[in-house]
């Protein structure tokens, strides 16, 4: 979808009667002239598992040091960002990877005080066995991320906590939650931003707008090489393995 069509899709919901009524309640009057619309309040829901795997398939690890707040603002520059809700799970049985993950999350929060909320799911360890040769191996399955996203999205819709929801994922398991959110809050606008190498025909059909996140947005939204926490003074540097 080109930029103009994307913008039209994003804002076309304003013609809906319910959305117009909602927007009328949010008019802002300044000292210089007539009332103006307040910026649309936006919450971004990031499926960390879906995003990370797409980034790795597309470019290895070089884009993992990603500023999700900056990316959200690049994707929706006309909206007023309330928060980025990041859903992930702690790495198991790999201390170096767990250290890199923790460093990234700390840098992300330090760079964007008050704008990032992180919800942790879990990985479940399972033993798999080859029926043909009898060999066995350990496999890790990510659990709870889709449930956590669904819970947050539906809760925000029910409480009218946001005007618009941007879901960074191509996981079609989120479809029931999206339908529920839309039924609970008919004025809340929802859109899907598909990570690299990811696409869902079901979500694309279900959502008023959907698009793939372009490489220029991803490369333009990298965190600084070193992030310093303004509160503690602690520094978090980009892992060498992510260069």
Predicted features along the sequence, with ranges:
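Intrinsically disordered, low-complexity regions enriched in Ser/Pro/Gly/Gln/His and often acidic
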Residues: 2-3, 38, 235
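Residue-level marker of intrinsically disordered, low-complexity segments enriched
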Residues: 6, 18, 26-27, 34, ...
